[in-house]
Amino acid sequence: MKKFDKLGLDNIKEIFHNLSYDELNAHEKANNEGLSTDNDTFCVDTGIFTGRSPKDKYFVKQDPSSKYIAWGKVNQPITKELFDKLLTKAKQELSGKKIYVQDVFCGASLQSRKAVRFVTEIAWQAHFVKNMFIRPSQEELENFKADFIVYNACKCINEDYKQDGLNSEVFVIFNVEENIAVIGGTWYGGEMKKGIFSMMNYWLPLENKLSMHCSANVGEKDDVALFFGLSGTGKTTLSTDPKRRLIGDDEHGWDDEGVFNFEGGCYAKTINLDPEHEPEIYGAIKRNALLENVVLRADKSVDYADASKTENTRVSYPIEHIENHEPSLKAGHPKNIIFLSADAFGILPPVSKLSKEQAMYYFLSGYTAKVAGTERGITEPQATFSACFGEPFMPLHPTVYARLLGEKIEKHEVNVYLVNTGWSGGSYGVGKRMSIKATRACINAILDGSITKCEFENFEVFDLAIPKALEGVESVLLNPINTWLDKNAYIATRDKLAHMFIQNFKRYEDVKEGIEFSKFGPKI
């Protein structure tokens, strides 16, 4: 108990420190925290919040970190006094109880990883942490010194939020100087995962390393590919490939040695999960995996089509559940980078090759359509721009990440492509979703290098290089104008989307890099 005195909790009944999966499973059942499915996967409800609460996330505004953080709607400031008040409240919630402490690493690179300690009163949240982060060896646990501590007091709410000037009784606060985060009022597991991701996105660029919201895999010839895209654009599905080893499905770093996973697990969407289309993910859902907000049938099997609790049903599992994973969770420098956009307007080509400068432009634009349920209040696709394909998690100015990406693309001669996994033949509601077969053919041509031998033509207004023919993809699909019956509607929609890109990019023109990169976008 003595080594936990620094946590500042009073009268702790018992501390369950770094429990095994079997022990966590026994605690979950004893605490009545959920149900077991027919194949012994534990299944929990996250309560009112089935997605993140981005409007309730804050950073403590104090020096020296305040001069690095890009303050605004994403990175909202909070005072040190208010943080202290809510941390005290959270510690009171966790005091006098039995608690779970889980020690993990974030980052598979020894030179770049951070040691994180999570404190919670819910066994399944400790289980989630064990699944999602890198599980230290016994020796590493014996010498574990936390760089950062997360207090998850999900049962604690802030009734005074109005007089405190906050958005709701939920709070997710990061104190960069004290290396502490506190969570209150939401049980959603993703707050812990994405919270530490936000911190990695603060720490690493200041060490001249790139942090990325992407998935990564590596081929038989050790060729590494990165897939960028927001939730629901196909990152997890497209990077899970039987011919390639999965490095990770969501969060990575890129340092002088190469690419490395931040995590030791995957957090996959399960809505309409089909064993035929996604056998690897389906097969990963077994004992030690943790299902969230799914509906069980009477025989305890999971009804993946049931979205009655949320569209954002999820499963977390240790990456070892994916047979074809890269055991070291790291690899060399990338050969190919793929930006995935689910274009709700049906304008972007299925695949385009980008120059280094265009790569920085489209990386900063982070265009896609928000897909149902990954955030509160979104129920159908809606066009959105999210800097670096992960704006909610980027504490620094987006051009910091873009500059690092550009430097690395140049240094390691990386090919960059933009792939549309969204609509074709018309906008959402008229056109149809790009088939996964066509998208896979585009991805395969990128990964096997055959796309580099194609003849390219210019895609007007956006000035993108698009292939005239590509094996496995109907040629008519390659240039979107050919898929629209109403050519006038196509031209009007194309110009409207180009205008949206131009308008969005103006927000980066507060710094000289932003003005420089703006030259490489669409022109009307």
Curated annotation (Swiss-Prot):
Q: One GO molecular function term?
A: phosphoenolpyruvate carboxykinase (ATP) activity
- Annotated Mn(2+) binding lies at K194, H213, D250
Taking the first listed entry, what is the main subcellular location of this protein, grouped into a coarse class? cytoplasm
Q: How is the cofactor bound?
A: Binds 1 Mn(2+) ion per subunit.
Pfam families tied to this protein = PEPCK_ATP
* The keyword Cytoplasm appears for this protein: yes
Kindly list the biological process annotations in GO that this record carries.
gluconeogenesis
Record's CDD domains?
PEPCK_ATP
Which positions does UniProt annotate for substrate binding?
R52, Y188, K194, R314
Question: What is this enzyme's catalytic activity, as reactions?
Answer: oxaloacetate + ATP = phosphoenolpyruvate + ADP + CO2
Q: Which residues bind ATP?
A: K194, H213, G229, L230, S231, G232, T233, G234, K235, T236, T237, E278, R314, T439
Q: Which UniProt keywords apply?
A: ATP-binding, Cytoplasm, Decarboxylase, Gluconeogenesis, Lyase, Manganese, Metal-binding, Nucleotide-binding
GO terms for cellular component: cytosol
Per UniProt, subcellular location reads as:
Cytoplasm
Q: What general EC class does the enzyme of this chain belong to?
A: lyase
Named cofactor requirement(s): Mn(2+)
Q: What's its EC?
A: 4.1.1.49
The pathway where this protein functions is: Carbohydrate biosynthesis; gluconeogenesis
Function noted in UniProt: Involved in the gluconeogenesis. Catalyzes the conversion of oxaloacetate (OAA) to phosphoenolpyruvate (PEP) through direct phosphoryl transfer between the nucleoside triphosphate and OAA.
Annotated family = Belongs to the phosphoenolpyruvate carboxykinase (ATP) family.
The protein's name is Phosphoenolpyruvate carboxykinase (ATP)
Question: What organism does this protein naturally occur in?
Answer: Campylobacter jejuni subsp. jejuni serotype O:2 (strain ATCC 700819 / NCTC 11168)
**Name of the coding gene:** pckA
